[in-house]
């Protein structure tokens, strides 16, 4: 009889989400996620409520993933980031982050909140 070692348990991960930039219509922001501990590979899907924001972003060597996004409507947007897991790493979802989006005026090199 040959005995094999039990497979190692997957590492539990935690994901956080943040927004960089002016949250205003027509103004591009960067949605950032951080997965800890840093997985080898995997993707993060950002969501606005239940709606996926673009394609899933690859997790970089430092455990971060990001996507650029322009909000098309004003009001409260509930943003989350889900790490989809990777070999040896469990999936995890961030806490919700409420982003209040106002009206914006995109002047190309600068974006101004208005109203």
Positions of predicted regions on the chain:
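Solvent-exposed beta-strand/loop surfaces, strongest in extracytoplasmic domains of secreted
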Residues: 1-115
């Amino acid at each position: 009889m040959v005995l094999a070692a039990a497979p190692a348990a997957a590492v539990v991960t935690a994901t956080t989400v943040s927004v960089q930039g002016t949250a205003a219509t027509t103004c591009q922001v960067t949605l950032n996620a951080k997965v800890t501990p840093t997985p080898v590979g995997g993707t993060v899907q950002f969501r606005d409520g239940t709606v996926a924001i673009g394609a899933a972003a690859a997790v970089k060597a430092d455990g971060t993933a990001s996507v650029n996004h322009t909000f098309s409507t004003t009001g409260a947007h509930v943003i989350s980031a889900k790490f989809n897991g990777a070999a040896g790493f469990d999936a995890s979802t961030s806490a919700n982050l409420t982003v209040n989006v106002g009206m914006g005026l995109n002047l190309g090199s600068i974006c101004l909140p208005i109203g």
